[in-house]
């Protein structure tokens, strides 16, 4: 018999397998929308965010590269705003440091312009075209002929975000559970 049956003898409305950022964010958002639902999050490791979530680059993406009008584009732009607001509200360290996308050769300009147009169409905040001088002002060790400045992107530790989701689920929704080593 699986271990979780001996730990929990309850019925749940929703069971989510995986205690990474996707599983925990899903459980948290579902509980916010449906506070009476009993949700069980099962994580096989000793702690949440032990795999991909805890080992990625931590980039807060802007929505720059996605096809305009796509769900990915909308969800990325909206999700970035929501993530940054969540991080501020819960005092999770993050840095909205921006990024520079650089064309180092004339042959790259057409693609860079396509990326810029995607960013505008997707509602990426503050995106602007920049020249070689501005590239150097932002990032002195970067060389390019033209570029894009995307000030709304940044970095965050998604393991910290996941741990906060697990903490909030346990504190706010006592009918729901996050169980590790299951």
Task: Kindly give the residue locations of the regions a language model identified.
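Gly/Ala-rich phosphate-binding loop of Rossmann-like dinucleotide-binding domains
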Residues: 27, 31, 168-170
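Conserved Rossmann-like nucleotide-cofactor binding loop
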Residues: 22, 26, 47
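Proline-centered flexible-loop/turn and helix-kink motifs
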Residues: 35-36, 88, 140, 174
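Beta1/beta-strand and adjacent pyrophosphate-binding region of the FAD-binding site
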Residues: 6-22, 40
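Helical element adjacent to the flavin cofactor pocket in flavoenzyme catalytic cores
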Residues: 148-182
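Glycine-rich FAD pyrophosphate-binding loop
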Residues: 31-55
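Dinucleotide-binding Rossmann-like beta1-alpha1 core, especially the glycine-rich loop
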Residues: 58-138, 144
């Amino acid at each position: 018999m699986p271990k979780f049956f001996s730990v929990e003898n309850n019925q749940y409305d929703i069971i989510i397998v995986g205690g990474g950022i996707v599983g925990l964010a899903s459980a948290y958002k579902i509980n916010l929308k449906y506070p009476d639902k009993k949700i069980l999050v099962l994580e096989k490791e000793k702690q949440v965010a032990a795999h991909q979530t805890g080992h990625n680059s931590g980039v807060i993406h802007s929505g720059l590269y996605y096809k305009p009008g796509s769900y990915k584009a909308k969800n990325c732009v909206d999700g970035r705003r929501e993530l940054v607001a969540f991080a501020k509200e819960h005092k999770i360290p993050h840095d909205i440091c921006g990024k520079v996308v650089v064309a180092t050769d004339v042959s790259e300009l057409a693609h860079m312009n396509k990326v810029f147009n995607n960013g505008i169409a997707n509602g990426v905040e503050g995106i602007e075209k920049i020249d070689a001088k501005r590239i150097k002002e932002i990032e002195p060790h970067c060389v390019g002929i033209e570029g894009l400045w995307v000030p709304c992107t940044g970095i965050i530790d998604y393991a910290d975000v996941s741990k906060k989701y697990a903490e909030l689920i346990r504190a706010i929704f006592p009918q729901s559970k996050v169980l590790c080593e299951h």
